[in-house]
Regions:
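Catalytic cores of DNA base-excision repair glycosylases
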Residues: 2-209
Length: 209
């Protein structure tokens, strides 16, 4: 795939959805961090249902700590791996208060030092909460990048690095959201909706329909 085709792909994504964003509901960097921590192996819909009850009660590190672990788990128990995730949330809140005055740091190294926060989670927060042009690669983006040949790679980091290198700079801020939405609703794992795909003619997937 060449530079001109990638340019056209993202031109089309932008024309169809000029202001893409996450489907997780949040109103602060802290709320986004908690939502992303809960979202591993869970749906955004499921996370939003839990945080719709949790955030009105506790949406700061201190308020979460005041709830206590059992209190937090009452709100997160509908989500997979909720016990581990809730412990990570409690530990993260303590660190945010002790080291960062209760604020979420806008720095990758600091974010990745928090319990349960890996590179992907850090990138989501940096991009969505702080407007940094970074690329969080999840299962949807990994699939789309490889299937279309926008940025084929054997592992998540290779795909991330290629996307950062290949995507025209003007699209980098929103590319994560366009690709994840495309993978979630059009370029699905088992039944890709090729007939409805706005980049069908540009895609290099051999089995496209």
């Amino acid at each position: 795939m060449n530079k001109q085709i990638r340019q056209e792909i993202f031109e089309r994504f932008r024309a169809a959805n000029p202001h893409p964003t996450t489907e997780l509901n949040f109103s602060s960097p802290f709320e986004l961090l908690i939502a992303v921590l809960l979202s591993a192996q869970a749906t955004d819909v499921g996370v939003n249902k839990a945080t719709a009850k949790l955030f009105p009660v506790a949406n700061t590190p201190q308020a979460i700590l005041d709830l206590g672990l059992d209190g937090v788990m009452e709100y997160t128990k509908t989500i997979g791996l909720y016990k581990t995730k809730s412990k990570h949330i409690m530990q993260t809140c303590r660190i945010l208060l002790e080291k960062y005055n209760g604020e979420v740091p806008a720095d990758r190294e600091a974010l990745e030092s928090l319990p349960g926060v890996g590179r992907k989670t850090a990138n989501v927060v940096l991009n969505t909460a702080f407007g940094q042009p970074v690329m969080a690669v999840d299962t949807h983006i990994f699939r789309v990048a490889n299937r279309t040949k926008i940025a084929p790679g054997k592992d998540v980091r290779e795909v991330e690095d290629k996307l950062m290198r290949f995507i025209p700079k003007e699209f980098l801020m929103d590319a994560h959201h366009w690709l994840i939405l495309h993978g979630r609703y059009t370029c699905k794992a088992l039944k890709p909706q090729c007939s409805k795909c706005l980049i069908n003619d540009l895609c290099e997937y051999p089995a496209k329909m």
